Amino acid sequence: MRLSWKERVFMVLLGVAAASGLTMLILILVKATNVLLPADTKFGILFDAGSSHTSLFVYQWPANKEKDTGVVSQALACQVEGPGISSYTSDPTQAGESLKSCLQEALALIPQTQHPVTPAFLGATAGMRLLSQKNSSQAQDILAAVSQTLSRAPVDFWGARILAGQDEGAFGWITVNYVLGMLLKYSSGQWILPEDGTLVGALDLGGASTQISFVPQGPILDQSTQVTFRLYGANYSVYTHSYLCFGRDQILRRLLAELVQSSQVARVRHPCYHSGYQATLSLASLYDSPCVHTPDSLNYTQNLTVEGIGNPGNCVAALRGLFNFSSCKGQEDCAFNGVYQPPVHGQFYAFSNFYYTFQFLNLTSRQPLNIVNDTIWKFCQKPWRLVEDSYPGQERWLRDYCASGLYILVLLLEGYKFSEETWPNIQFQKQAGGTDIGWTLGFMLNLTGMIPAEALTQWRAQSYSIWIAGVVFAVLTLVAILGAAAVQLFWTQD
């Protein structure tokens, strides 16, 4: 039976429609690939409650993790107005109130839908450690006040506590190595562990304590100085030790107290203050710290006059008297005060007051040790009036830079046992990779290991060329079907 031309056209159009539709279906099902949509972003809020001030940091990371640890970056840094929270002993509620301005700035940055699942934490360091020793109930009242403020915020409050010195040192080490790409780096479109990354040591000088943390060449013989943790699927063993009362503010307080006790008069000649400097202070304010030994016969109502003489040699001698070096005499694995320390090894980043002091003295460009020493001595020998005229608007810390600079040299060279050969291994930095160096980022990296990860959402998708081909065959199928319908319609009318 011979088909009419209408029947032949109708059959051809049906065949084209079937072939085009089948081809389109094959392209969709066979050529499709699984595409991972970008992960949602999570946020975390951390308060660093130091001895002299408090800072807030907001960190962010993808909701999915790399080897059980979040890939964290800094989104905000905010310095809280006022002193450190340990200063609010007479009115603890003000410690909590002081945090509100920075907290509001953080909440404005974080999407409102994320507020209830954003962890917030306050870690207090050496200033509160000292207050806890002096008056534990006052320390608890302050922690309760800041906890009350943060628990009322629309965030997931994880608590406020005093960090151990060892934790502060270890988290600082994590921060330095993370921002330098020693723990994880981005390569060929993915995050990978560095094959042979040289780990960097961390040197932290706060107001009340100082920390040294590094991975030594050999084993750590004193287990009390060893911290182990797991990040991005790798295990780390780090030497770390914190020296309470050896922070910048407390060492200068101790130094002045020693000068007062040795002079036995109400007028003290201070070798670390510039010649021509003079100030009056109360003895009560000097001895208001657990770091300072209080004499039995102290007249708290007496005032003290301090005169600067600008003698860096005598200043160094006085600073050395605050260390117990004899307890480590002849021992290579001992720092000072009888504390075990393996020989320093590798590169180090020095931050906090290490950086602030050397930045003021213009010594952060890795100058040789002899240049550093010469620069500090010459600065110490400048008369006070010349120093004031040379640095307007910096009166708050100006008198202390001489003592701080010389103290850093004594601490690093005679305390931590750096030498002229290893001095070039120290970099004085505030930031690395646009991120502030301190314990907070290391803490957040560790914290993300406790926050559940979210799986990436998968979608079936095609490449652009396959998508275009699919559209062409879809249009061809539609045209063939419409053509067949038209032929059928005209055929029926005939």
Curated annotation (Swiss-Prot):
It comes from the Eukaryota. Its EC number is 3.6.1.5. The lineage of its organism: Eukaryota, Metazoa, Chordata, Craniata, Vertebrata. The gene is Entpd8. This is Ectonucleoside triphosphate diphosphohydrolase 8. Residues 1-8, 487-494 are cytoplasmic. Glycans are attached at residues 299, 303, 362. Belongs to the GDA1/CD39 NTPase family. Disulfide bonds join 78-102, 245-291, 328-334, 380-402. It comes from Rattus norvegicus (Rat).
